[in-house]
Amino acid sequence: MKPTTIALLQKYKQEKKRFATITAYDYSFAKLFADEGLSVMLVGDSLGMTIQGHDSTLPVTVEDIAYHTRAVRRGAPNCLLLSDLPFMAYATPEQAFANAATMMRAGANMVKIEGGAWLVDTVKMLTERAVPVCAHLGLTPQSVNIFGGYKVQGRGDAGDQLLSDALALEGAGAQLLVLECVPVELAKRVTEALSIPVIGIGAGNVTDGQILVMHDAFGITGGHIPKFAKNFLSTAGDIRAAVRQYISEVASGVYPGEEHSFH
């Protein structure tokens, strides 16, 4: 299998070919995902909750992400691998660059950072220094204390601000955008306005791609299950079949359905 590139995702967007992505944290699952056709993976700071058992992503460190990035890269050598910069790892552009370098050395192809137009200088600095950036707007879990919990973002006038932020981040050099927990109508506006691929999670089926936390995709999340999650393992029978079903339902637009979407 040839390495998956950002240019390929750009081609998918132009061809309106929806693609599926997933979080991965270890060698074994990364290899399984790659074998079944998932060629874009994220080492997310969600590991703070799914792997480490915290109640938020805030305790996750740069070294935590780097450790899991190395493991995932060994399992999926040809995937396009995104790694989160965790909470307080990019408070300044200089800090962001130092920590992004750690991720790239660990095997990441690009780093993901959460936040709006205040990150323009950081995105510009990283891009100019050959570090590809995936921006993340909408519900940004590192800001949970400001949002007052995990709530849908971008309703009303806030939608205009989010679109403005998305355009500013693209202008600064961001090459991908993750859009989390926003109304379908806003997700459509953003996806159509941007020339870069938009990956949704809780943003309806109008984005260029979808991402799920692997634990949500297989129904092994304890406690609250997000509205946008679907347990593909419940009908597929085994994990490999569940991965193939996820890829297929994203490609056809079946997932996410209306029951997984916000308005």
UniProtKB/Swiss-Prot annotation:
Alphabetically ordered keywords of this record: Cytoplasm, Magnesium, Metal-binding, Pantothenate biosynthesis, Transferase
Tell me where in or outside the cell this protein is found.
Answer: Cytoplasm
Reported EC number(s) for this entry are 2.1.2.11
UniProt record, GO biological process? pantothenate biosynthetic process
Q: Which GO terms describe its molecular function?
A: 3-methyl-2-oxobutanoate hydroxymethyltransferase activity; magnesium ion binding
Enzyme category, top tier: transferase
**Residues holding Mg(2+):** 45, 84, 114
Q: GO cellular-component terms in the record? A: cytoplasm
Any idea which positions bind 3-methyl-2-oxobutanoate? 45-46, 84, 112
Catalyzed reaction equations: 3-methyl-2-oxobutanoate + (6R)-5,10-methylene-5,6,7,8-tetrahydrofolate + H2O = 2-dehydropantoate + (6S)-5,6,7,8-tetrahydrofolate
What is the active site of this protein? 180 (proton acceptor)
Q: What is the UniProt remark on how the cofactor binds and its stoichiometry?
A: Binds 1 Mg(2+) ion per subunit.
Q: Which SUPFAM superfamilies match?
A: Phosphoenolpyruvate/pyruvate domain
Query: A single Pfam family, by name?
Result: Pantoate_transf
- Residues in a coiled coil are none
Cofactor (UniProt): Mg(2+)
Which pathway does it serve? Cofactor biosynthesis; (R)-pantothenate biosynthesis; (R)-pantoate from 3-methyl-2-oxobutanoate: step 1/2
The UniProt function text for this chain reads:
Catalyzes the reversible reaction in which hydroxymethyl group from 5,10-methylenetetrahydrofolate is transferred onto alpha-ketoisovalerate to form ketopantoate.
Family assignment from sequence similarity: Belongs to the PanB family.
Tell me which PANTHER family the record gives. 3-METHYL-2-OXOBUTANOATE HYDROXYMETHYLTRANSFERASE (PTHR20881:SF0)
Q: Report quaternary structure and partners.
A: Homodecamer; pentamer of dimers.
Q: Mind telling me what this protein is named? A: 3-methyl-2-oxobutanoate hydroxymethyltransferase
